[in-house]
Curated annotation (Swiss-Prot):
Top-level taxon: Eukaryota
Protein name (record): T-cell receptor gamma chain C region C7.5
Pfam families: C1-set
Main location: membrane
Bilayer topology annotation: Single-pass membrane protein
Length: 172
C-alpha cells in the first residue's frame, strides 16, 4: 500500500553517552533510534569501527507509528573500550543503494572532553552574594508593595472625603 517513490528506508537519530554516566558508572551507552521505515523486517548490530566482531547490544521492541515502523538499539561500552569508535549497522531491504547503512559514533573520551560541564557557583562567597541579592530584592518589593497600599489608602480617603463634602454642599 506504500507509494513506490516514498523514502521508506530507516532514518537514524543518534544519542551519545552522558558525561554523568561515563564518570559515575565508567561505561557509556550509545543509542540509535531508527524511524519511518517499511516493512518491519530489519536487522541492527554493532561493531567497532575497525573491527569485524559483532558486539553484544540490546534492542527495543518494534513500534508501529502511523504506516511505518520504529526500532531502537543501544550499545553499552565498558571503560576499556571508551577510546574506540563504534558503528551501528542497519540491514533493511529499502536502504539506499541496497547497501547496509552504517552510522558512526565517536569515541566516548572525545564526547566527555567536548562536553565538560561548567560550574556557575564555584565559591561559597558567590552563593552568599546570591542569597544577599535575592533577600535584598525580596525586601525591596515588599517595601514597594507596602508603599502602594498606603498610597491607595490615602487616595481613597481623599476621594471619599471630597465626595462627601461635595454631596453635603449640594443638599444645603
Amino acid at each position: 500500500d506504500k507509494k513506490l517513490d516514498a523514502d521508506i528506508s530507516p532514518k537514524p537519530t543518534i544519542f551519545l553517552p552522558s558525561v554523568a554516566e561515563t564518570n559515575l558508572h565508567k561505561t557509556g551507552t550509545y543509542l540509535c533510534v531508527l524511524e519511518k521505515f517499511f516493512p518491519d523486517v530489519i536487522r541492527v548490530y554493532w561493531k567497532e569501527k575497525k573491527g569485524n566482531t559483532i558486539l553484544d547490544s540490546q534492542e527495543g521492541d518494534m513500534l508501529k507509528t502511523n504506516d511505518t515502523y520504529m526500532k531502537f538499539s543501544w550499545l553499552t561500552v565498558p571503560e576499556r573500550s571508551m577510546g574506540k569508535e563504534h558503528r551501528c549497522i542497519v540491514k533493511h531491504e529499502n536502504n539506499k543503494g541496497g547497501a547496509d547503512q552504517e552510522i558512526f559514533f565517536p569515541t566516548i573520551k572525545k564526547v566527555a572532553v567536548s562536553t565538560k560541564p561548567t560550574t556557575c557557583w564555584q565559591d561559597k562567597n558567590d552563593v552568599l552574594q546570591l542569597q544577599f541579592t535575592i533577600t535584598s530584592a525580596y525586601y525591596t518589593y515588599l517595601l514597594l508593595l507596602l508603599k502602594s497600599v498606603i498610597y491607595l489608602a490615602i487616595i481613597s480617603f481623599s476621594l471619599l472625603r471630597r465626595t462627601s463634602v461635595c454631596c453635603n454642599e449640594k443638599k444645603s
